[in-house]
């Protein structure tokens, strides 16, 4: 088995999908989890205005709507959380995503004060954060807020990780990578677009250039610039297609060097890091 085949198998990626079937699969997956653990009353998700959180949010609200109707349990809710750092440049996209999702509840937590306070505390201890590390601080502060909300609403935190993100490890460890349940896992980027198209999502929410937008020095830096490959390249790779050698090597290098992000903390029984 080639490395490409191993990666595709590990991430559960498929070369083709039926959008309606995958929507149903994700919604049923969320419903089944909630029914298995009846003490869970809410799904909590940060909404950025980008493709992934818009899709995950819509699926969450669909699952909650169906489950409320089927069980008559009115205590179930989906909580969409806005998590700007100061003023978000694409705030209108966030509002458009909220309008599309129609969440039960919307909360806004501005993380800037918490990030600056943490940075100042570290500075006083003699640690000056780089812009890159400050970006990770933002991602972790966002997850901290979501877990606090989930803790107070008997909820779980929903993630937006999918195959095209997992393959490169393009998420912050214990930040946006630290969630309870991932309904998009297995899909690549273009497949996520297929689901949003089937759901009637406004095109500008999934046709915009994806960006983590964590670095102050490089605001709205496109993911594809940071990665050195395009999402079309990544999707083609995950669909088993042949790519130019350098492109395939870049993707595989990202996968191998970020393996630790896709695993629990390393213990004495692990040996993947020696290979």
UniProtKB/Swiss-Prot annotation:
Molecular function per GO: ATP binding; glutaminase activity; metal ion binding; NAD+ synthase (glutamine-hydrolyzing) activity; NAD+ synthase activity
UniProt binding sites for ATP: 46-53, 160, 189, 211
Keywords noted in UniProt: ATP-binding, Ligase, Magnesium, Metal-binding, NAD, Nucleotide-binding
Keyword match ATP-binding: yes
CC per GO annotation: cytoplasm
GO annotation, biological process: NAD biosynthetic process
Binding-site residues for Mg(2+), renumbered to this chain: 52, 165
Gene3D superfamilies: HUPs
Pathway, per record: Cofactor biosynthesis; NAD(+) biosynthesis; NAD(+) from deamido-NAD(+) (ammonia route): step 1/1
Binding site for deamido-NAD(+): 140, 173, 180, 260-261
EC number: 6.3.1.5
Protein origin, superkingdom: Bacteria
InterPro entries documented for this protein: NAD/GMP_synthase, NAD_synthase, NH(3)-dep_NAD(+)_synth, Rossmann-like_a/b/a_fold
Catalytic activity: deamido-NAD(+) + NH4(+) + ATP = AMP + diphosphate + NAD(+) + H(+)
Record's keyword annotation contains Magnesium: yes
Enzyme class: ligase
Pfam families: NAD_synthase
Subunit record text: Homodimer.
Family: Belongs to the NAD synthetase family.
Protein function: Catalyzes the ATP-dependent amidation of deamido-NAD to form NAD. Uses ammonia as a nitrogen source.
Protein name: NH(3)-dependent NAD(+) synthetase
Native organism: Shigella flexneri
């Amino acid at each position: 088995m080639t490395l490409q085949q191993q990666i595709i198998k590990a991430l559960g990626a498929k070369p083709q999908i039926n959008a309606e079937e995958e929507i149903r699969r994700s919604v049923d997956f969320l419903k089944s989890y909630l029914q298995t653990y009846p003490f869970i009353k809410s799904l909590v998700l940060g909404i950025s205005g980008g493709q992934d959180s818009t899709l995950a949010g819509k699926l969450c609200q669909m699952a909650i709507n169906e489950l409320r109707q089927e069980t008559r349990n009115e205590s179930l809710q989906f909580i969409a959380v806005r998590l700007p750092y100061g003023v978000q440049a694409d705030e209108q996209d966030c509002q458009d995503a909220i309008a599309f999702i129609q969440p039960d509840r919307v909360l806004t937590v501005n993380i800037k004060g918490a990030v600056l306070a943490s940075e100042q505390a570290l500075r006083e201890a003699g640690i000056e954060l780089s812009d890159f590390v400050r970006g990770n601080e933002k991602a972790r502060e966002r997850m901290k807020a979501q877990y606090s909300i989930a803790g107070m609403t008997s909820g779980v935190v929903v993630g937006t990780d999918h195959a095209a993100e997992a393959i490169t490890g393009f998420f912050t460890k214990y930040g946006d990578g630290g969630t309870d349940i991932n309904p998009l896992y297995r899909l690549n980027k273009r497949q996520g677009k297929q689901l949003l198209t089937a759901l009637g999502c406004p095109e500008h929410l999934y046709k915009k250039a994806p960006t983590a937008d964590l670095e102050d020095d490089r605001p709205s830096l496109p993911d594809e610039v940071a990665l050195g490959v395009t999402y079309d390249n990544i999707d083609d790779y995950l669909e088993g297609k042949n790519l130019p050698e350098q492109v395939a090597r870049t993707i595989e290098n990202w996968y191998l060097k970020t393996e630790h992000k896709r695993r629990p903390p390393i213990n004495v029984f692990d040996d993947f890091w020696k290979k």
